[in-house]
């Protein structure tokens, strides 16, 4: 009887873990069009593989510890960027990077990659819906692009940092 109870508990734990992984995979896949996410690798925010992929894209689920719904689908340069960002190191990508965030984002500083508290309206990005992001290895090429997230079009987020990238909103913003 004790063995049956043990196996029932173990089976319940395993099913709960599988359901959590399934939810994370579904969340991650919502970040990009199905043409990208259907065959993408899916990892969690500890960079543990939840599902293998075969198209060069990697998707990550919404981060439950942040406000907003913010899953990502990224190519290899963005994966390099995210690994460096998490470790507070300089990214080493050498190719153009693309990232999809079709579900939106969490509120974030436009200037300070590690800010955790809201700042001024001119800095704090709160209403960002679906968007794409681009990395350019030579960030000197970004100098003539606006850094104003309220300009109505593309802008540079985190300018003058190793994490500078182009934000491309896909929805109207106020």
What are the language-model segments listed below?
Residues 22-174:
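Primary mode marks residue(s) on the alpha4-beta5-alpha5 output face of response regulator receiver
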Residues 5-13:
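Sec-dependent N-terminal signal peptides
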Residues 1-2:
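N-terminal secretory signal peptides that target proteins for export/translocation
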């Amino acid at each position: 009887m004790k063995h049956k109870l043990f196996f029932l508990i173990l089976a319940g734990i395993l099913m709960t873990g599988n359901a959590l992984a399934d939810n994370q995979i579904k969340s991650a896949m919502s970040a990009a069009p199905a043409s990208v996410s259907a065959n993408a690798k899916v990892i969690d925010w500890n960079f543990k593989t939840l599902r293998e992929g075969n198209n060069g894209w990697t998707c990550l689920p919404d981060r439950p510890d942040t406000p907003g719904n913010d899953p990502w689908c990224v190519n290899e340069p963005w994966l390099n960027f995210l690994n460096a960002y998490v470790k507070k190191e300089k990214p080493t990508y050498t190719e153009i990077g693309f990232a999809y965030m079709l579900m939106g984002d969490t509120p974030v500083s436009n200037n300070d990659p590690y800010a955790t508290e809201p700042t001024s309206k001119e800095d704090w990005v709160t209403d960002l819906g679906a968007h794409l992001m681009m990395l350019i290895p030579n960030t000197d090429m970004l100098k003539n692009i606006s850094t104003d997230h309220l300009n109505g079009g593309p802008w540079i987020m985190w300018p003058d940092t190793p994490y500078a990238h182009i934000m491309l909103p896909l929805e109207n913003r106020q």
